[in-house]
Amino acid sequence: MPSLAEEICIGNLGSLQTLPESFTWKLTAADSLLRPSSAVSFDAVEESIPVIDLSNPDVTTLIGDASKTWGAFQIANHGISQKLLDDIESLSKTLFDMPSERKLEAASSDKGVSGYGEPRISPFFEKKMWSEGFTIADDSYRNHFNTLWPHDHTKYCGIIQEYVDEMEKLASRLLYCILGSLGVTVEDIEWAHKLEKSGSKVGRGAIRLNHYPVCPEPERAMGLAAHTDSTILTILHQSNTGGLQVFREESGWVTVEPAPGVLVVNIGDLFHILSNGKIPSVVHRAKVNHTRSRISIAYLWGGPAGDVQIAPISKLTGPAEPSLYRSITWKEYLQIKYEVFDKAMDAIRVVNPTN
């Protein structure tokens, strides 16, 4: 795959006055995850996923209903301060406003994940995506920040650390709610219970800062192509410019408009496995805008490190509902997803659904 510097540089997309052919998507079969009958238009219907107040006494039921219906929901009164959300959005804007040459100094390596670059799913699509991003998956981001902000890196590293700490607590809280809606608890997940008792982390988090520049022909471009997240769940903060869309068979593409202080939660592949298929991992994408750029910050809460085997929760299986998926480690699943992309779930499936 050519390096970022050899192609139209993603760091300069916002300055282009015409849409390059390599970034021009067709209006039909725009991505491989859509059924042919549904892949005829980029238009989204006027509907949206529910906004759930986490202080509501019925929060577990509400989250469960939304998760089963949409594989996604929005949350308010989640405990994350507006200042922290503003700080990480400002950090992202400062980073993406830098000259392209400067950003490329913090580019991710060929074998690494952390750093600046195009979406990880790019190799699976013929056309390029109208976006740039910065991934924080380990402590190497501190070196990148030192390169980008020689005098202010300590301040920006502090923002990231606070965001990770707060999102980790929120993700754990949401996990309890979603499990509760299925009638199970973390104690019913043997490996998760052991990790909690030992003081270890149930999941590993990463952050993806995304920037979708203004686009001369947004109706023919794609900011981020349709996909599911590999995670247990993903928590997304989006700036005040819309672009996120989720897909549901009964509804088609549905735009998730941003609202102040509201976060979006997407169910990922790992939770779909844990739930034995009862809760879907949501297919989603990002569209772009002709007049306004968009920033989003995704907290990707994945599986645990090491050789922990992840499989459907035993209480959710039985003679009438056999396990749909074989056990797998987080690392192994990521490798399969990297190789076969949207066919990863099929690759670990052991039986067909009974209905």
UniProtKB/Swiss-Prot annotation:
Superkingdom, natural source: Eukaryota
Stored InterPro entries: DIOX_N (IPR026992), IPNS-like_FE2OG_OXY (IPR044861), IPNS-like_sf (IPR027443), Iron_ascorbate_oxido_reductase (IPR050231), Oxoglu/Fe-dep_dioxygenase_dom (IPR005123)
Functional note: Converts the inactive gibberellin (GA) precursors GA9 and GA20 in the bioactives gibberellins GA4 and GA1. Involved in the production of bioactive GA for reproductive development.
Disruption phenotype: No visible phenotype, but abnormal formation of the seed coat.
Pfam families to which the protein is assigned, alphabetical: 2OG-FeII_Oxy, DIOX_N
Pathway(s) where this gene product acts: Plant hormone biosynthesis; gibberellin biosynthesis
Matching Gene3D superfamilies: B-lactam Antibiotic, Isopenicillin N Synthase, Chain
Coiled-coil residue windows: none
Transmembrane domains' residue ranges: none
Gene name of the encoded protein: GA3OX4
The enzyme's E.C. designation: 1.14.11.15
GO biological process, one term: gibberellin biosynthetic process
PANTHER family listed in its UniProt record: 2-OXOGLUTARATE (2OG) AND FE(II)-DEPENDENT OXYGENASE SUPERFAMILY PROTEIN-RELATED
Family affiliation: Belongs to the iron/ascorbate-dependent oxidoreductase family. GA3OX subfamily.
Protein name: Gibberellin 3-beta-dioxygenase 4
Catalysed conversion reaction: gibberellin A20 + 2-oxoglutarate + O2 = gibberellin A1 + succinate + CO2
